[in-house]
Amino acid sequence: MTLAMVKQPEKTHSPSLIDGLADAELTPEICNLEYWLQAIRCSLRGYVHGHTPGLAVPRHMLEPGPLREASLQEFAFRATTEQMTARHLSHLVRTAPDQATMDFFATQLIDEARHADVFRWHLVEMGIPRATLEARMAEIVGNKRDAILRPLEQFALDLVAKPDADFIGGVIFLTVIGEGALAPAAEMSERKWRVFDPPAAEIAQGANMDEVRHLGVGAEVVRAHIERHPQERGRLPELIQRGLQLWQELPILPLLIEREMLFQAGMEQHRSLLGDYELIPGRRLADTTVEERIGLQAHWADEMRGQRLVRMGLTGLTVAG
């Protein structure tokens, strides 16, 4: 069997999540176990804990201040979400309707567990002792876990953990509602830490390369399901609407504002390090504002969701996310 149908991008010139999802035409059959083994061998080659060996956390990220606090908050939260995603995936592996789909979600489960691990390890690299890491993460994430992540987890468990598990509903949760909705923040993370914290940017880039595959295949699994079961065209959009309505009810915006305000304050302190580095073409990161970066993530969310809905065959669906 040839694996040349889809080539995993080299980490040095990998696409962004946005561009990657626009181009992705992936299936569980293409992204099988052998493909995954070769893909991670390529994308993680030479890396230790998700980044180039010897690439140290810069001194300014080790010193107390808003920039460090922004990073600690972000990576503690992301490590927690990835851990919860891995647990959700165990239900998809258990209930997958065929071998190819089961194998794919098994690889995604390992990917998400790896993401959680490298995010946690970055906190250690930033000076948090391993012995107190879990307690410190719980302190950093705080009530955000109960206010944001627990309701999402319960929404997902209501789909996949019951005896008559809704497998395709669980896939939609990951692809549109849960992991898919978090993807814009992941894209922003890779871009905004590239100068301030190169190890963090490499870690984020590696995770984002995986997410292109996860979201692309997830959309294809839903598309194929709808093709086989056209009667689901009525139920699945309603499920997406309920999930996105839940997002609107959760305190996501205050979390983003808090994180971006810390980043903004840190950026003001260390502006000279950025030079002319651009967040997006034609726009220097040093010139961006809290509102602009949050607005950009909202724009990316709409764009990426639209791409996935088109791929799923749900182009007539109107959602407010």
Map each language-model feature to its residues:
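Non-heme di-metal
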Residues: 2-321
